[in-house]
Amino acid sequence: VHLTADEKAAVSGLWGKVNVDEVGGEALGRLLVVYPWTQRFFTSFGDLSNAAAVMGNSKVKAHGKKVLNSFGEGLKNVDNLKGTFASLSELHCDKLHVDPENFRLLGNVLVIVLARHFGKEFTPQVQGAFQKLALGVATALAHKYH
């Protein structure tokens, strides 16, 4: 993915303000609620029976933090997303058998959560940069599937 200098500045500027614990848990939780078929990959997480259970689930929050920390690593290596996410792509493809479409869905949910948290600061330009980055990360995570 190619981000312009302005897009990189917009992404890194906002990312420095992101509460990874909070945003990660909310993003993964929303993915599991909005797209309930994704829950099949998280059967060991316990009660995912309704939105309140999902959003309050400590394992969802912990894994969301882990996911968002990985996304943050991608920000540090935006010019080499395939390399950055190669081992995670292999894990999700070969061992976990995750549908690669889920990566795109999670990226879109992340953008929604960021917009919710940052309001007016999440301008259309910032959104565009994050959408581009989220798609790049999703593509890198899906790389082993091709």
From Swiss-Prot:
An example Gene Ontology CC term for this record: blood microparticle
Domain Globin: 2-146
Residue(s) carrying S-nitrosocysteine: C93
Residue positions where Phosphoserine is found in the record: S44
Modified residues annotated as N-acetylvaline in this record: V1
Keywords: Acetylation, Heme, Iron, Metal-binding, Oxygen transport, Phosphoprotein, S-nitrosylation, Transport
N6-acetyllysine PTM positions: K59, K82, K144
Residues annotated for heme b binding in this entry: H63, H92
GO molecular function: haptoglobin binding; heme binding; hemoglobin alpha binding; metal ion binding; organic acid binding; oxygen binding; oxygen carrier activity; peroxidase activity
CDD domains membership: Hb-beta-like
InterPro entries linked to this entry: Globin (IPR000971), Globin-like_sf (IPR009050), Globin/Proto (IPR012292), Hemoglobin_b (IPR002337), Hemoglobin_oxygen_transport (IPR050056)
One Pfam family in the UniProt entry: Globin
SUPFAM superfamilies linked: Globin-like
One GO process term, biological-process aspect: hydrogen peroxide catabolic process
Tissues showing expression: Red blood cells.
Subunit: Heterotetramer of two alpha chains and two beta chains.
Summary of the function given for this chain in its UniProt record: Involved in oxygen transport from the lung to the various peripheral tissues.
Family designation: Belongs to the globin family.
Protein name (Swiss-Prot/TrEMBL): Hemoglobin subunit beta
Source species: Myotis velifer
Origin organism lineage: Eukaryota, Metazoa, Chordata, Craniata, Vertebrata
